[in-house]
Amino acid sequence: MSDAADKVADQLAILVARIKERMIEGGVVRSDETYIRYLDRIIPGGSARGYFWVYRGLDGDVIFDWQTSREHHHLADWLGADFEGILQSDGYEAYERYCELQRRRGKDVRRAACLAHIRRKFEKALKERPALVRWILKIIGRLYRTEAMLREHRAPPEVRARVRQNLSRPLIRLLGKAFRHLRATAILPKSTLGQALNYALGQWSAMETYLEDGRIEIDNNDTENDIRPSAVSKKNWLFIGHPEAGRRSAILYTLLISARNHGIDPQAYLKDVIERLPSMRPADLDALLPSAWAAAHRAKHPLAKPDRTATAA
């Protein structure tokens, strides 16, 4: 990144802080992480792995948080000791440990799992037991068809929860019972299928969270999609030039990807924000958040189509 971009990112940090406040207040955070190498002269070999920890809120806002490791405390430091609500993630143990820590503090925190990660584990085991794994994938497919129907009808959270209780809960229970039976039989624990079963059962309690709360998605794919632009840059850049550059990259990613998720042109949004931010009063800064900017843009241009690069929140 250029020096000019570094300075801009520092100015934009105040907006990222406000997005974080609103996300935490919303009570639902979806998280994932991805790595990219960074350069640092004080490290043997001159480079190491850094990580973008990514957090997504209910409305499509996304925050990229740069850290130089994948250590568990980064998650706890970001969410804080007062967070209550639902944390959706894959099976990386940092997420469940944070939820357990919060519950010991007397906080109402639950974790929601990701069915897409579970499905991928079984897809890898397809060659070992084709008929059995196809049956498992068929049941998972039925769960996803229910979600597609709910999206098609734009069902509100309370309807989603009700439909899931009627249609999806019996299938979740059926799969859980089947997984426990299979693990207790002759499936080798170290086989691909055995590993898939162990992973699924380790996630199954958290998998039921989406049945109970209609705000939650069946998987964490939206958050994974948010990470993909950084993966593209990772191929282009090969590395981040310095740990501090990682922090500034995270600030820009936060605003650009959030803008995209709200259906607006990220470049047009960022250009306008950079021009207006220096003269804005602190009390008026919320108008520059991606969600507010998108709403104002739609009010001015009611017939304009959403930017094609945007994804549904």
Residue ranges and their predicted role:
Residues 1-313:
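Catalytic center-proximal scaffold of phosphoryl-transfer enzymes
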